[in-house]
């Protein structure tokens, strides 16, 4: 483990090493090849084999390359993320940015209201919400896109928390000086907003580190079941005898719905038409003489009233009425006994007769006057 101690000592000497200097000072391959022993190929020898490099033996916090020097030089840096641990001595030179070997700047070191990552910052801030997901990186590399500064304050005031814009919009800047110290830019922009009564901001305003990942917050587990007051046996199908392969015999399965006892049979149905009692037999003769033979015949037994016939299941169908007889044929046209004369001839006859009568009457009047 001597080479491991050497590695830790070299890593601890500088908190901010350049990638090339780090690669020069730490030559893991030389350490792996180091060792004592003698012998040729095929012959036996003595010595100790090199121990493999383990991930937990490397202090990853010491890889703090300056942001301006932390750039990927390889072509396929994002292809296999496991190479950052398995082949880290090469990846720290070729892919320091993809392997997150860069040191993080502080918000206090920011002096210009710009985006150090260029046009990508706007996409990260607006579409991916990275200002809240990665606050340390976004607050220093995308200060303008996260709205930690702006032209409202001439780019001279910088907020120290990416949540400042939400605090200012909900009126927290008017609640105390602490918010004004952390958020000088947004408190100046939203100074006219008063705090709402209920405070709709969902995030905690005070915590040790406001952006702890969910793994760091211990999630409450499910509530434990209350203890039973007494030990309860397993359900019946799993209650086996302590003897092997001899389960308890199952009890008789009760009927889930017990049936009531059957009712007693009904008494015999009485005859709806009781029969009269039979006449008593004739009394024996009391006299000394022989009894007359044959005895008087018994009175005729009245016949029982016949049962009414059962009603038919369906009413009898009435036969349809016969069709009406066909109407008699119309009589032939009856001829008139005296056909009327033609009206035109009758009119002519009457006009001639009237003219003769008028002429005769005129002549008689004329003769009387003369």
UniProtKB/Swiss-Prot annotation:
Residues 34-55, 306-370 are annotated as: Disordered. InterPro entries: ShKT_dom. The keyword Signal applies. Disulfide bonds join 70-102, 77-95, 84-99, 113-149, 121-142, 131-146, 164-183, 173-187. Residues 306-340 have a biased composition (Pro residues). It is found in: Nematocyst; Secreted. GO terms for molecular function: toxin activity. Belongs to the NEP3 family. This is Nematocyst expressed protein 4. It comes from Nematostella vectensis. The lineage of its organism: Eukaryota, Metazoa, Cnidaria, Anthozoa, Hexacorallia.
């Amino acid at each position: 483990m001597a080479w491991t101690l050497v590695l830790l000592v070299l890593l601890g000497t500088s908190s901010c090493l350049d990638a090339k200097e780090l690669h020069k000072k730490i030559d893991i391959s030389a350490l792996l090849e180091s060792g004592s022993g003698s012998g040729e190929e095929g012959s036996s020898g003595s010595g100790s084999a090199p121990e493999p490099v383990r991930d937990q033996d490397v202090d990853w916090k010491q890889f703090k390359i300056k942001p301006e020097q932390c750039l990927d030089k390889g072509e396929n840096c994002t292809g296999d993320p496991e190479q950052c641990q398995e082949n880290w001595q090469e990846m720290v030179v070729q892919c320091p940015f993809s392997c997150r070997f860069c040191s993080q700047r502080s918000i206090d070191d920011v002096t210009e209201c710009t985006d150090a990552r260029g046009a990508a910052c706007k996409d990260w801030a607006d579409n991916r919400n990275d200002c809240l997901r990665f606050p340390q990186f976004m607050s220093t590399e995308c200060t303008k896109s996260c709205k930690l500064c702006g032209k409202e304050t001439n780019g001279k005031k910088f907020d120290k928390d990416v949540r400042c814009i939400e605090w200012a919009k909900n009126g927290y800047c008017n609640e105390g000086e602490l918010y004004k110290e952390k958020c000088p830019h947004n408190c100046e922009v939203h100074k006219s907003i008063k705090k709402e009564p209920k405070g709709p901001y969902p995030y905690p305003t005070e915590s040790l580190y406001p952006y702890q990942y969910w793994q760091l917050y211990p999630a409450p587990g499910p509530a434990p079941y209350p203890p039973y007051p007494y030990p309860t046996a397993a359900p019946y199908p799993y209650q086996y005898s302590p003897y092997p392969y001899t389960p308890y015999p199952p009890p008789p399965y009760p009927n889930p719905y017990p049936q009531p006892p059957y009712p007693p049979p009904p008494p015999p149905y009485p005859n709806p038409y009781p029969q009269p009692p039979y006449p008593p037999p004739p009394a024996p003769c009391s006299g000394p003489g022989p009894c007359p033979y044959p005895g008087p015949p018994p009175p005729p037994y009245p016949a029982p009233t016949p049962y009414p016939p059962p009603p038919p299941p369906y009413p009898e169908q009435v036969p349809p009425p016969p069709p009406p007889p066909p109407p008699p044929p119309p009589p032939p046209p009856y001829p008139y006994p005296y056909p009327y004369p033609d009206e035109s001839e009758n009119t002519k006859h009457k006009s001639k007769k009237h003219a003769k009568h008028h002429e005769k009457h005129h002549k008689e009047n004329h003769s009387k006057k003369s």
